[in-house]
UniProtKB/Swiss-Prot annotation:
PANTHER family hit by this protein: PROTEIN TRANSPORT PROTEIN HOFB HOMOLOG (PTHR30258:SF1), TYPE II SECRETION SYSTEM PROTEIN GSPE-RELATED (PTHR30258)
Residues annotated to bind ATP: G264, P265, T266, G267, S268, G269, K270, S271
Entry-linked InterPro entries: AAA+_ATPase (IPR003593), P-loop_NTPase (IPR027417), T2SS/T4SS_dom (IPR001482), T2SS_E_N_sf (IPR037257), T2SS_GspE_N (IPR007831)
UniProt-recorded Gene Ontology molecular function terms: ATP binding; ATP hydrolysis activity
Source organism, top-level taxon: Bacteria
SMART domains named among the record's database cross-references: AAA
Lineage start: Bacteria, Pseudomonadati, Pseudomonadota, Gammaproteobacteria, Pasteurellales
Keyword Mitochondrion attached: no
Taxonomic source organism: Haemophilus influenzae (strain ATCC 51907 / DSM 11121 / KW20 / Rd)
Gene name tied to this protein: hofB
Family: Belongs to the GSP E family.
Annotated protein name in UniProt: Protein transport protein HofB homolog
Keyword rRNA processing: no
Cysteine pairs bridged by disulfides in the record: none
Pfam families registered for this protein in UniProt: MshEN (PF05157), T2SSE (PF00437)
GO CC terms of this entry: plasma membrane
Length: 464
């Protein structure tokens, strides 16, 4: 009987006293991970209820368990074995290969090279990251090279949440793989780069990713902005506006000309508010044009254009062209400078309804911001119909009610987000805010049991 066959009956006792029966069949079932297991000096001991028990010789090798868990999609339980015992078992499982020490050195040496034939673990690892991000509804994926680890974090409902750490030996290959997907220069790690690519999930969903790289002290950092390429429900009720706010917004949207601004920081939901307004306005008798960076949601019946600064196609050039295209409604992704502000105001004064965004903390600050961009007070009064300031707050989880129950997969007490709003509109020869500021709007959501005061404080701070 060969040493390989003897493994069918061989038992191994872990340092914690637990006894395992070694299964070559389990080793064979993990064939795609064998080079990875040898690289980490690790041995699969048992698989049960979709959980994998992994033998290692040191708790410092926990990153191996986390990486293999990511690749296999199974929780991994680390089991400490004697180093000599682990070496003997691995050697019996690979009798026709080089000595275990040489195999470990060989596979670890391979980590310094990006080789196509050894891409499978990296591809599986990235696929698992993408699938996990989709399942958790993450808007951004952060991949960060640290001193000893490669950190993965997902931004879920506006909050960064750490994911299992990955061994740093994968860092360069993951980064190179992502650069290949985004058609970037793999060899350039001294300068930031930006790119895009698509990923098809197990369930045939298409994810669009915007990729940004950044050189750091320990290596490159990558941030991926995820966007699902599928229909999105756009309705005022989903935004979280009150009935009065919805009606006020729709009344202003029904005006033939003027400027409507949505304000707030990055990630406050401004784009969704604009898309919802455009969808409500979208009828066959209206010519609607948008200038965006990038196009986040595709809307049938609307002419959407994306800026391309590399060839000189910026917001200002698109806006000037739009005015020669006989539009009824124009959406400008963002008013960024004096020129775009002037063009937007002139369009709003000459028979067009213009929608855009500004980065200001509240509604009233939008007026001073326009003045800083060179717009005169009388021009603002003649054109500006409505300013909506907004934020997104997390909703209490409908399963656990925010009680942070361990059995709930939200793990944070929250699931999903909803908007809180402040309206500033022209009324009786002056601009008037509606009766709610952002905090009052948020506290109303608290009284309705939608969110809690801690979340309002997190989003708004103490000054709003």
């Amino acid at each position: 009987m060969t040493s390989y066959a003897l493994l069918h009956t061989q038992r191994v006792t872990a340092k914690n006293g637990e006894v395992f029966t070694i299964s070559p069949d389990l080793w064979e079932r993990n064939q795609q991970q064998q080079s990875l297991l040898l690289r980490y000096f690790a041995l699969p001991l048992k698989e049960e209820n979709n959980r994998l028990w992994l033998g290692v010789d040191s708790l410092s090798n926990l990153s191996a368990c986390e990486t293999i868990a990511f690749i296999t999609g199974k929780p991994v339980e680390p089991i400490l074995l004697e180093s000599s015992q682990l070496k003997e078992l691995l050697q019996q499982l690979t009798p026709n290969q080089m000595q275990v020490e040489e195999q470990v050195k060989f596979y670890q040496h391979q980590e310094t090279h990006f080789e196509q034939e050894d891409d499978e673990p990296v591809i599986r690892l990235l696929n698992q990251i993408f699938e996990s991000a989709l399942q958790k509804n993450a808007s951004d994926i952060h991949l960060e090279t640290l001193a000893d680890q490669f950190q993965v974090r997902f931004r879920i409902d506006g909050v960064l949440q750490p994911q299992p750490l990955i061994s740093k030996i994968f860092a360069n290959r993951i980064i190179s793989r992502l650069k290949l997907l985004a058609k970037l220069d793999i060899s350039e790690n001294r300068l930031p780069q930006d790119g895009r690519f698509q990923f098809k999930t197990t369930f045939s969903d298409i994810l669009d990713f915007r990729l940004s790289t950044l050189p750091t002290h320990w290596g490159e950092k990558i941030v991926l902005r995820a966007q699902q390429n599928k229909p999105v429900e756009l309705s005022f009720s989903e935004l979280g506006m009150t009935e009065n706010q919805q009606q006020a917004f729709q009344r202003v949207l029904s005006q033939p000309q003027g400027l409507i601004l949505v304000t707030g920081p990055t990630g406050s939901g401004k784009s969704i508010s604009l898309y919802t307004a455009l969808q409500w306005l979208n009828t066959p008798d209206k010519h609607i044009m948008t200038a965006e960076d990038p196009i986040e949601i595709e809307l049938d019946g609307i002419i959407q254009s994306q800026i391309n600064p590399q060839i000189g196609l910026d917001f200002n050039r698109l806006l000037r062209t739009f005015l020669r295209q006989d539009p009824d409604i124009i959406m400008l992704g963002e008013i960024r400078d004096e020129e775009s502000a002037m063009i937007a105001l002139r369009a709003a004064q000459t028979g067009h309804l213009v929608l855009s965004t500004l980065h200001t903390n509240d509604a009233i600050s939008a007026i001073s911001r326009l003045q800083q961009l060179g717009i005169q007070q009388y021009e603002i009064k003649n054109s500006l119909l409505l300013v909506i300031a907004q934020r997104l707050v997390r909703k209490l989880c409908s399963k656990c009610g925010g009680n942070l129950a361990n059995s709930c997969d939200c793990h944070q007490g929250y699931r999903g987000r909803i908007g809180v709003y402040q309206f500033l509109h022209w009324q009786q020869n002056d601009y008037q805010t509606d009766f709610k500021n952002l905090r009052a709007s948020g506290l109303e959501k608290v009284s309705q049991g939608i969110t809690d005061e801690k979340e309002i404080e997190r989003v708004l701070g103490k000054n709003l």
